[in-house]
């Protein structure tokens, strides 16, 4: 495995959590584009080590299946490059993701089949990345993939296409794949932000009928590029999401390439200025930055010592405690610098350090996109407009109620009710926290709890269009210190967009507590304060600071369609809460997407985008399972035989197996109450024990039901429905099969029956599990797995 460090959010400006071990490797095709040394390729491949590791531990039996192969295949000589390219796309270099395991891409996790699948997967990704404006077909790989691995090719290709890792975006070849008419279920998407647009395009390509309801008069959500213009001077100002944080594998970088646009690298140079406008002494700057990072290191060690208790402690409390202990006589300038770094941290997390979880505030660091931080020339609105093209969006439709049930969904917006088979909710976490949308029935308590636990912070901006650039053109950012720690985030950082906006555009950021106070500050007062800072910096240098031609002050906290900026892990929360928020509800009727539903990429534009692709795949899978169930329900007698075949196939790779017991259940639904199917295999007749004490443990009910079968058959399989939690509890029963049978029938009170006795309820469960694992090529022969006694 290629290992990553877990760097902290320390970079000036929007934090760049660089992956040092990856960036130290050679990265081909990241050439500087002509015309400007700061413009870079929007996506690139990487090369590095690829270590193949076959899982074969003491608790796992690696199984080989006929027709798949018994040795590692060789596709080409670029396996190392392809592995690292897959790494930038979010895949482990030599193992499967949880999503792949749930999708059932290989017959068994571990072993030669998995290694070959990974090689094929990486090769397909690499092939598409060579020309991201093309549509890659499965037939393109028939000559390079050995025939005996055709099932793995099917599995890898289907997975990558369905989940949006290849063949996505706005290129013409991809647009051409949209069907002329929808032939599948109808889907309602609430919100036309990046996640909603990504899901809409993917679902439309799958053949679904899609309707997007957007409360605003525009698409994009928290990604908003405003055209500023005055006196024949214009500029494109990103008032919301503005920085592409990492370009290696970033799907939005791929969209930019499909648009034919290069990205502008944000330069690291960021000088700081004191309250009086004078530059901060470089030596003092370095000294305080080192000390600040040391405090973060101490806080990291502290949480390890505290364990779970650190969930209830804030990062701010830990930092302040260490600061007080480590320094007595702190100069005013040093204290101002320390507060500037706190403001920068609050900017990176859109939350006060006093509310960030010490335990998990940086839990997403290991998954950070590698590469530079970049601007898109012309603004990110270009991405939005391209993604919104030909998507049926109804604007100024504020959703009040979402009803979901077994018969479908109903979404109320104003006086109109929209009906569909499924609904995808992509509204920001702030809207969910506010209870702006009523869900009927109410959301599960675990989802309500995670909505409450997660933090949702605030970042505001002052965008200023000047008649000309008066600031230094050799930097893209500069910072300013404040005296009052309560206002440390007020205009603490300036971004120059002049190289990409089309005009002399400067944006001042307002973070932390200051961002909340800024919401009620009159715009004229805000602009006056900013100009006072700028003139204090530049006029002593003999540089005149002109009045801006146009200004815009954001109010994201007061926007009813966002009620904040982006999510963070607050005290009491964890990365698990992102996963819980992402869970579907109502047996595949209500789904959730958005930056607050990904634990890997929260608070990022690309995070929002990939969750839309993720949920499109989940919704398609759910619709497929529902279709299978309907066919079974319409003609149960005709489908009884096919369900028996499905059940036999599923039990060849059970989720749990111990003694004579095998259990299958959904791998996507972690709910302890979700259904599971148990199979008990009795291999020979059992003699009734005459000892009355022993008879108490011999499962009398089972024997009474099956005694006649024992006398006629050498082997019999009996079944029952139970919950996932009951299955897990049964596995923990000690004393062998007899004890488990007694626990099952006497303690749990379940009845073991033949296959036909399971009923149509079990048929529905079987169909759902089978549809969930579509793409898995099961062998025709039975194999034995790991067992415990």
UniProtKB/Swiss-Prot annotation:
Induction: Induced by dehydroabietinal-dependent (DA), a diterpenoid tricyclic diterpene that promotes flowering and systemic acquired resistance (SAR). Residues 1-23 are annotated as: Disordered. Its EC number is 1.-.-.-. The keyword Ion transport does not apply. It comes from the Eukaryota. Disulfide bonds: none annotated. Keywords: Chromatin regulator, FAD, Flavoprotein, Isopeptide bond, Oxidoreductase, Repressor, Transcription, Transcription regulation, Ubl conjugation. Residues 76-177 form the SWIRM domain. It is an enzyme of class 1 (oxidoreductase). GO terms for biological process: chromatin organization; regulation of photoperiodism, flowering; regulation of timing of transition from vegetative to reproductive phase; response to diterpene; systemic acquired resistance; vegetative to reproductive phase transition of meristem. InterPro entries: Amino_oxidase, FAD/NAD-bd_sf, Flavin_monoamine_oxidase, Homeodomain-like_sf, SWIRM, WH-like_DNA-bd_sf. Disruption phenotype: Delayed flowering. Impaired systemic acquired resistance (SAR) toward pathogenic bacteria (e.g. Pseudomonas syringae pv tomato DC3000 (avrPto)). Lost ability of dehydroabietinal-dependent (DA, a diterpenoid tricyclic diterpene) to trigger flowering and systemic acquired resistance (SAR). Its cofactor is FAD. FAD binds at residues 195, 214, 216, 222, 240-243, 595, 604-605, 607-612. Sumoylated at Lys-287, Lys-693 and Lys-770 by SIZ1. Sumoylation alters its activity and the histone H4 acetylation status of FLC locus, promoting FLC expression. Changing residue 428 to L: In sof1/fld-6; weak allele that suppresses the down-regulation of FLC by FCA. Interacts with HDA6. Belongs to the flavin monoamine oxidase family. This is Protein FLOWERING LOCUS D. The gene is FLD.
């Amino acid at each position: 495995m290629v290992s990553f460090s877990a760097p902290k959010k320390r970079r000036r400006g929007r934090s760049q959590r660089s992956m040092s071990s990856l960036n130290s490797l050679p990265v081909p095709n990241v050439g500087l584009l002509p015309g400007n040394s700061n413009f870079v390729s929007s996506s690139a491949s990487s090369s590095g080590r690829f270590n193949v590791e076959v899982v074969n531990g003491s608790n796992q039996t690696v199984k080989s299946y006929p027709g798949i192969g018994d040795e590692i295949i060789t596709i080409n000589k670029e396996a190392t490059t392809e592995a690292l390219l897959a790494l930038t796309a979010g895949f482990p270099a030599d193992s499967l993701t949880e999503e792949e395991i749930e999708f059932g891409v290989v017959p068994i996790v571990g072993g030669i089949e998995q290694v070959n699948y990974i090689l094929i997967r990486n090769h397909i990704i690499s092939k598409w990345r060579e020309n991201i404006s093309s549509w890659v077909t499965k037939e393109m790989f028939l000559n390079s993939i050995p025939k005996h691995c055709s099932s793995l090719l099917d599995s890898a290709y289907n997975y990558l296409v369905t989940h949006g890792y290849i063949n996505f975006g706005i290129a013409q070849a991809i647009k051409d794949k949209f069907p002329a008419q929808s032939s599948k279920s109808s889907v309602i998407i609430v919100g036309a932000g990046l996640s909603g647009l990504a899901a809409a395009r993917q679902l439309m390509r799958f053949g679904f009928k899609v309707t997007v309801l957007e409360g605003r008069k525009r698409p994009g959500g928290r990604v908003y590029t405003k055209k500023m213009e005055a006196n024949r001077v214009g500029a494109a100002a990103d008032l919301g999401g503005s920085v592409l944080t990492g370009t290696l594998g970033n799907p939005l970088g791929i969209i930019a390439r499909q648009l034919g646009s290069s990205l502008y690298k944000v330069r690291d140079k960021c000088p700081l200025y004191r309250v009086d406008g004078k530059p901060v002494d470089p030596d003092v700057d370095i000294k305080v930055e080192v000390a600040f990072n040391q405090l973060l290191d101490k806080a990291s060690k502290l949480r390890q010592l505290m364990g779970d208790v650190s969930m209830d402690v804030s990062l701010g409390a830990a930092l302040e405690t260490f600061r007080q202990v480590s320094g007595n006589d702190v100069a005013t300038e040093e204290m101002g610098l320390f507060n500037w770094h706190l403001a920068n941290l609050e900017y990176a997390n859109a939350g006060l350090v006093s509310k960030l979880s010490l335990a998990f505030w940086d839990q997403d660091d290991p998954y950070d996109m590698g590469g530079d931080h970049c601007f898109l020339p012309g603004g990110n609105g270009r991405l939005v407009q391209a993604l919104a093209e030909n998507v049926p969006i109804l604007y100024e439709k504020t959703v009040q109620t979402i009803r979901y049930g077994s018969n479908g969904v109903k979404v109320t917006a104003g006086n109109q009710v929209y009906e569909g088979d499924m609904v995808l909710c992509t509204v920001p976490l702030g809207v969910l926290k506010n209870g702006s949308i009523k869900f009927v029935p109410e959301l599960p308590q675990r989802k309500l709890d995670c909505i409450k636990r997660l933090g949702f912070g605030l970042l505001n901006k002052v965008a200023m269009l000047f008649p000309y650039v008066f600031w230094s053109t050799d930097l893209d950012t500069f910072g300013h210190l404040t005296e009052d720690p309560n206002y440390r985030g007020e205009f603490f950082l300036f971004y120059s967009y002049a190289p990409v906006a089309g005009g002399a555009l400067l944006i001042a950021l307002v973070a932390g507590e200051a961002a909340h106070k800024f919401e009620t500050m009159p715009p004229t007062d805000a602009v006056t304060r900013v100009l006072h800072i700028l003139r204090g910096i530049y006029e002593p240098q003999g540089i005149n600071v002109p009045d801006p031609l146009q200004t815009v002050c954001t109010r994201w906290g007061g926007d009813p369609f966002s009620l904040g900026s982006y999510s963070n892990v607050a005290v009491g929360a964890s990365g698990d809460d992102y996963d819980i928020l992402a869970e579907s509800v109502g047996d595949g009727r209500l789904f959730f997407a958005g930056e607050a539903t990904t634990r890997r990429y929260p608070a990022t534009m690309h995070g929002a985008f990939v969750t839309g692709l993720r949920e499109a795949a989940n919704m398609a899978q759910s619709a497929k399972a529902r279709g299978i169930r309907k066919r079974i329900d319409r003609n149960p007698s005709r489908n009884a035989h096919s369900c028996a075949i499905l059940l036999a196939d599923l039990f060849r790779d059970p989720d749990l197996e111990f003694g004579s017991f095998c259990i299958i259940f959904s791998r996507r639904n972690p709910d302890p109450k979700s259904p599971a199917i148990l199979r008990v295999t009795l291999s020979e007749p059992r003699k009734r024990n005459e000892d009355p004490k022993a008879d108490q443990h011999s499962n009398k009910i089972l024997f009474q039901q099956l005694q006649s079968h024992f006398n006629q058959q050498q082997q019999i399989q009996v079944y029952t429905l139970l919950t996932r939690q009951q299955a897990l509890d049964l596995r923990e029963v000690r004393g062998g099969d007899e004890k488990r049978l007694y626990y099952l029938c006497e303690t749990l009170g379940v009845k073991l029956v033949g296959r036909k006795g399971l009923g149509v309820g079990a048929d529905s469960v079987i169909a759902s599990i089978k549809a969930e694992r579509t793409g898995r090529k099961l062998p025709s022969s039975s194999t034995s797995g790991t067992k415990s006694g």
